[in-house]
């Protein structure tokens, strides 16, 4: 193992331009002093390794783990896969009264919006039911009852990136951060007034305590939102200057099944449908009658917000869905076992990989840069590869659903609109792995895993400089042989 502490890199690479340039880039960055860097570069055409540095050393991948999850999901679930949400009734209907229960059964859809619940409520109304003399029951038994991935830390459970996973869930908008609400915080009418808070979806399932104040236009903007650990009570504190732009904060909810069920109950009320009984959770009986089904977008469409925006919840849903579809058990244990088996069959060495979740949020995940470039190489031969490639963020493209997490990186360079790669960030970890085409049209696969740095300033610049340099080259692969 080699640390970047000013020592020369491997002598075998010193005489080659790629090694010299990458050495220069990493050596010039004080942020990498005492840190680890795993770098792997391959020919996209042949898979030949043309450069590696500590590329066999296992490192934390952060959200580069999503590259494995997406590939396994496409291979196992297929491009036609959709998630269904089903509406059932059980009982006797007399005129417009249902003497019985309504069941909302979730099957993992992480993209359910308020408008989708509205659509299901309209389907219920079309049954000429306006009064339910019984209960409204949410069924999330498609998956197991473990809502958090194995290594998630307690403090992350309130954050959108650590939201609880459920087979029945709701998202606030078309970024599809399932299991969250969106709080939009704007300045009040004048200094001294409370900030104005709007919530999507608007629901009383979450209580908001607004302590944020409006300050003069030249004041400091400092808004903080915290949620009680085991209650859906969110407290907003801090200051927001007059005339400043709205602050948007996604916050995870406690009990996402109950959240989705409450949003659906509100949709029923919009349709004039009342429920006399309780709102609770349970299993849909076999004798219940299905009256409506909502289908999600297809898997390739879902991969766009998943990969572009690096949506952790989507990753964990896909893991559970793989377990459910192939093994009948919607659990992390089953899903990860199946994913690892399929990735092995694709040509990866999963014995060398520690895969603890689907998103990469775990600090225990481990993979080498060479194994990531190996995956990106073998994926090219799959029929689903165009969907996989399309889901990757594109450098310097502002449209969120194209550029994603690379939208503001490598602007006005040879990498702009060229580099397609997955980013990754957790504490002391920054990663970038994907594809780039050189100036002369050569396809390059790269993985840059940076671990154990103390300051993150300049870390992404290292990755960007390497990717840009690759994009600028002519006849790179020929010159490196």
Residue ranges and their predicted role:
Residues 39-41, 85-87, 433:
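Short beta-strand scaffold segments in enzyme catalytic cores
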Residues 2-46, 51-58, 118-127:
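Beta-lactamase-like hydrolase cores
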Residues 26-27, 81-332, 337, 341-346, ...:
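Conserved serine DD-peptidase/penicillin-binding transpeptidase domain
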Residues 1-29, 188-193, 199-202, 213, ...:
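N-terminal secretory targeting signals
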Residues 50-52, 113, 319, 323-481:
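Small-residue-rich helix-loop
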Residues 12-16, 20, 60-68, 77-78, ...:
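Soluble non-cytosolic domains of exported or imported proteins
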């Amino acid at each position: 193992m080699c640390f970047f502490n000013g020592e020369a890199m491997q002598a075998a690479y010193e005489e080659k331009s790629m090694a010299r340039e990458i050495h220069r880039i990493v050596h010039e960055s004080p942020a990498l002093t005492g840190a680890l860097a795993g770098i792997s570069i391959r020919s996209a055409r042949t898979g030949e390794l043309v450069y590696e540095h500590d590329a066999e050393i296992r490192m934390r991948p952060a959200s580069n783990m999503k590259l494995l999850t997406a590939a396994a999901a496409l291979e196992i679930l297929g491009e036609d896969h959709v998630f269904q949400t089903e509406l059932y009734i059980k009982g006797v209907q007399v005129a417009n009264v249902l003497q019985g229960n309504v069941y909302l059964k979730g099957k993992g859809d992480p993209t359910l919006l308020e408008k989708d619940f509205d659509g299901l409520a309209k389907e219920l109304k079309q049954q000429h039911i306006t009064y339910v003399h019984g209960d409204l029951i949410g069924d999330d038994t498609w998956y197991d009852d473990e809502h958090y991935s194995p290594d998630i830390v307690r403090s992350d459970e309130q954050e959108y990136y650590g939201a609880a996973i459920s087979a029945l869930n709701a998202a606030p908008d078309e970024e599809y951060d399932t299991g969250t609400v969106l709080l939009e915080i704007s300045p009040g009418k004048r200094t001294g007034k409370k900030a104005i808070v709007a919530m999507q979806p608007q629901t009383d399932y979450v209580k908001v305590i607004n302590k944020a104040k409006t300050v003069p236009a030249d004041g400091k903007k400092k808004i903080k939102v915290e949620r009680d650990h085991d209650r859906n009570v969110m407290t907003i504190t801090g200051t927001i200057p007059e005339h400043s732009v709205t602050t948007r904060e996604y916050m995870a909810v406690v009990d996402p099944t109950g959240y989705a069920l409450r949003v659906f109950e509100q949709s029923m009320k919009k349709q004039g449908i009342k429920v006399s009984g309780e709102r609770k959770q349970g299993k849909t009986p076999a004798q219940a009658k299905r009256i409506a089904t909502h289908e999600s977008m297809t898997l390739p469409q879902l991969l766009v917000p998943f990969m572009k925006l690096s949506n952790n919840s989507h990753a964990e849903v896909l893991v559970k869905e793989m377990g459910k579809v192939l093994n009948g058990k919607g659990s992390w244990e089953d899903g990860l076992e199946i994913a690892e088996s399929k990735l092995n069959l694709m040509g990866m060495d999963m014995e060398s990989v520690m895969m603890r979740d689907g998103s990469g949020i775990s600090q225990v995940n481990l993979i080498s840069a060479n194994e990531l470039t190996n995956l990106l190489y073998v994926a090219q031969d799959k029929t689903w590869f165009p969907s996989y490639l399309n889901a990757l963020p594109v450098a310097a493209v502002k449209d969120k659903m194209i550029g994603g997490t690379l939208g503001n990186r490598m602007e006005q360079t040879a990498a702009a609109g060229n580099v397609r790669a997955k980013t990754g960030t957790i504490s002391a970890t920054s990663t970038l792995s994907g594809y780039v085409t050189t100036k002369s049209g050569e396809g390059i696969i790269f993985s840059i895993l940076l671990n154990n740095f103390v300051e993150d300033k300049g870390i992404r610049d290292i990755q960007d400089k390497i990717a840009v340099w690759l994009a600028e080259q002519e006849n790179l692969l020929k010159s490196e042989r």
